[in-house]
Structure formats: C-alpha cells, structure tokens
C-alpha cells in the first residue's frame, strides 16, 4: 500500500509497504492479469483509443512478459506492490510510455476484480476435474468390494453391519454435492466486472461485451 495523496509530508515506512504488498502471493495471477490486459487493449483499439500498431506493440510486450514469467526469468520486487504494477512497469520498460496508455478506462480496482474472478474460474475447473477423478476411484473401490461387510457406527459405537461399498459410496454422494456447489460458485464468479473504474464508471465508451467475449 502506498500513500496516494498530496497531504502527506513524507512517504510511508518501508516496513508498512512490505507488510501491505500483495506481490508475494498475487503474482500467481500473472497469466490472468496479462490475459485481461490483452483483451482490454483489443477493446481500446476497437473504440479508437489505440491504433492497430499500438495495440499490437502492447500485446507483443505482454506476451513477452508472460514468457519471461513462465520461464522463471522475471524478478518480482516488493516495491512493485502487486502483480498489476509489476506487469505494467515491465511493459513500460519494454515498449516505452505507450505501456501506460493501456491503463486508459481501467482502474486497479477493475484489474483486481477481473484477475480474481478469472483465477477462480480456472481453479474451480481444476478442482472439479480432480474431484471427478477421486469420485471415479471411489466407485472402482466400491465395485471391487461389493461383498465386504463392515461395522456401521453411530455415536462412536458399532451399530449395524453395512456393506463397505455403501460406506464408500456415501463419500461419493458427498463429493457429488461438492461438485454442485463448485458449479454454482463458477456461475457466481463468471461475471464481467470491468467498467466500474475506481467507483462509478468512466466517460470512455468502453465495450464491456467485447472484452467479456474475448475473455470467455
């Protein structure tokens, strides 16, 4: 966190900046941040803010940054504060002041909301795939132990004899409910947040539908 204002006589303590910096954990969202910026640049080109040449230069710079991070050749610094600033700073280093033009019609709040939603969408799908694999394994175990009898417990005491396969399928049903919850969660995060700006929108004629379409 930095002090964005003119009423302060000096900058914030370095300890405060280190404590508030999110770059240490939000750097995992670099792919989402870059994808969002590429889509935003294409939208800015469509509405006439960026020329074709400018958009291509920005996109190529962002692709280069992603490749650097993918290959472990990108160094993150606490002074960058967050992934958005780190990417923007490197972009300006690569292509000059044009990199700052990418921020037109978009605030940090926009980027945070978008990156988190895109990251969650990806992780929800990953978790669903892993959960389905686990459910398949449970079914296999249940089918191969159809005749195995085990004690069923209630109140920590043995109560009735049950089939081990039924016991395993109980976990299958629990995970099936979890899949339903994940699908509902996906619907809730699959919403386009861009366009609000810092608070109540912007005077630029942003095409939110195009950006949403580009991002899937």
What annotation goes with each model-predicted range?
Residues 1-201, 205-214:
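A helix-coil-helix interface module used to build multimeric assemblies
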């Amino acid at each position: 966190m930095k002090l964005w204002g003119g009423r302060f006589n000096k900058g914030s303590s370095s300890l405060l900046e280190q404590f508030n910096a999110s770059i240490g954990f939000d750097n995992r969202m670099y792919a989402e941040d870059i994808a969002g910026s590429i889509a935003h640049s294409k939208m800015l080109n469509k509405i006439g803010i960026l020329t074709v040449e400018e958009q291509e230069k920005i996109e190529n710079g962002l692709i280069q940054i992603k490749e650097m991070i993918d290959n472990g050749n990108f160094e993150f610094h606490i002074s960058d504060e967050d992934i958005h600033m780190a990417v923007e700073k490197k972009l300006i280093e690569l292509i000059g002041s044009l990199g700052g033009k990418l921020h037109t019609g978009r605030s940090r709040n926009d980027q945070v909301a978008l990156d988190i939603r895109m990251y969650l969408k990806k992780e929800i799908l990953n978790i669903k795939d892993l959960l389905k694999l686990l459910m398949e394994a449970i079914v296999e175990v249940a089918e191969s132990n159809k005749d195995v009898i085990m004690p069923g417990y209630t109140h920590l005491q043995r109560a009735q004899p049950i089939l081990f396969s039924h016991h395993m399928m109980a976990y299958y049903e629990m995970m099936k409910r979890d899949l339903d919850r994940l699908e509902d969660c996906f619907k809730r995060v699959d919403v386009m947040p861009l366009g609000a700006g810092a608070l109540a929108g912007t005077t630029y004629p942003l095409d939110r539908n195009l950006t949403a379409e580009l991002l899937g």
